[in-house]
Amino acid sequence: MNWRKLLMGGGAAVGAAAAFNHLASRDVGPLENLIGGTEGWFEWRGHRVAYTRRGQGPAVLLVHGVHAAASSYEWRQNVEPLALAHTVFTIDLLGFGRSDRPTLRYTTALFLGLLSDFVRQVVAAPCAIVASSLSGAYAIVLGARDPGRFPALVLVGPTGIMRLNRNARASGDFARIAVDTPVVGTAVYNGLVTHRSIRAFLETSYADDALVTDAMVDVYYRAAHQPGAKHAPAAFVGQQLNIDVRDALRRLVQPALLAWGEQARMAPVEEMRSFLSLKPDFEPVIFSPAGDLPHDERPDEFNEVVSGFLAKAEQEETARG
């Protein structure tokens, strides 16, 4: 074997990967706050976590789902209506959105700690959680641990029973390390979050794919290409963020609304039954036509249902004293 040729070929491949990475991130500016409200920064473990605050009343925290292009932009059609009667907080999880994206080991425990500390230190009051997908699983665990701090839950297509419930295996850790590898791993990541692939992901997420606009794709693309953007998604791919919620579900005592889109594809509505079997007193609601993001696809209906649910939960809490 001609080692010189092999090394030259490897160097060329790395060079090509570096060039591809440069093109993928070229002209990608920082993310703006596109949901309004007062912007804030939570200094947490040496990193800055972005959040917004809007309105007055009982506190509500909106937590976005977990994927390569995730951010609180997901809640852009819900913040203002819910803030009519509540103090509404949104948060960009560490590694996502406008928050810092440090090179570190992202885990379920990290995000549970972040959310718990944020509510304790920033919200500083009992706080209902509205969370989607994998973050819905985190909300379940937090609610089971501390029902006084989290007096009501709204879970949108949560995971933790049939999906994203298994602990990381060796193959998952290998996938995380592969994506986290400099240059080549970054090229793999950038190849997965092109404009085309993000559009396809969004079109799969909505029952009506005509709702996916070029402007929306651009926001998600920029979210997926901020400096350090690959680290948290690498942990997701590596199954480091999974959590089994079955035990926590059985221990929930606070009011909980379970929301689903009837045409959801990534989290089919049939999965709702597995949650209801473990917690029959869930208040279930199915939005149609809607896919995996019913809060964005049917915002008026979603906001009305959630506002009514929260008002009822708050009245019951007041009556209990």
Residue ranges and their predicted role:
Residues M1-V60, L84-H86, A125, A311-G321:
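Alpha/beta-hydrolase fold catalytic core
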Residues R251-A290:
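Conserved loop-alpha-helix segment in the C-terminal half of the alpha/beta-hydrolase fold
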Residues E80, F89-V130, H295, E304:
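Active-site loop/oxyanion-hole signature of alpha/beta-hydrolase fold enzymes
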Residues T52-R98:
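Conserved HGGG/HGGXW glycine-rich cap/lid loop of the alpha/beta-hydrolase fold
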Residues N165-N167, Y189-R250:
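Conserved alpha/beta-hydrolase catalytic His-Asp/Glu region
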Residues P280-G321:
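Catalytic active-site module of serine/aspartate enzymes centered on a nucleophile-bearing elbow/loop
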Residues H67, L93-G97, G160, R265, ...:
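Alpha/beta-hydrolase active-site loop signature
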Residues A125-A168:
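Conserved hydrolase catalytic core segment
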